[in-house]
Regions:
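Bacterial N-terminal signal peptides
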Residues: 7-17
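Short, low-complexity N-terminal intrinsically disordered segments enriched in polar/charged residues
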Residues: 20-64
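Short beta-strand edge/turn micro-motifs at domain boundaries
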Residues: 27, 138-166
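Hydrophobic pocket/interface hotspot
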Residues: 49, 61-62, 69, 81, ...
Length: 166
């Protein structure tokens, strides 16, 4: 009887210890998987951004920004909120009817970081004039992003010029 009690006690102890040890491994892998998922979702902002600009889809473009996002589009040209961001894009050269640009990007220059519910995104934009086949403009975007209500959105956009190095 004594051996049976010791055996049951040891068995219970093994079950408890193995259950505790197993949870830390799965949570570490879950964290790694969540991080990879977040990096992917943030990188999709760049894809949506360039697609919206190429198609001149202002609603899609503005939907990538948080409601209270800020955008700096040049020295002294900082705006806040989706409506002001919308107006900057609608008044830009790329949105004019006579402008036929395709927004391309060198994927290898894409940089994404994530830290919990916040992250950063950097990309270049190469605007190709469809009529001439030549590069019409080079720009870059440095973005702060945040997960808001389960969706990654741009909270701060800093546009700049980029140098094309071949």
């Amino acid at each position: 009887m004594r051996k049976l009690l010791i055996g049951v006690a040891l068995g219970a102890l093994i079950v408890v210890v193995s259950a505790c040890g197993g949870s830390s491994g799965s949570s570490a892998s879950e964290e790694a998987m969540q991080r990879q998922s977040d990096l992917y979702e943030i990188s999709q902002i760049e894809r949506g951004f360039h697609e919206a600009i190429s198609k001149k889809d202002i609603d899609k473009l503005v939907s990538l920004f948080a409601p209270n996002a800020t955008g700096t589009f040049g020295p002294g040209k900082t705006v806040a909120g989706r409506e002001q961001i919308r107006q900057v894009w609608l008044n830009s050269l790329g949105w004019k009817l006579e402008t036929h640009w395709l927004s391309d990007h060198p994927a290898y220059k894409l940089k994404v970081t994530v830290d919990g519910d916040r992250g950063t995104l950097h990309f270049e934009c190469h605007f190709i004039d469809i009529d001439t086949g030549k590069v019409a403009a080079l720009t870059a975007g440095n973005l702060d992003v945040a997960r808001i209500d389960g969706r990654w959105l741009i909270t701060n956009f800093l546009g700049s010029t980029a140098e094309l190095k071949i």
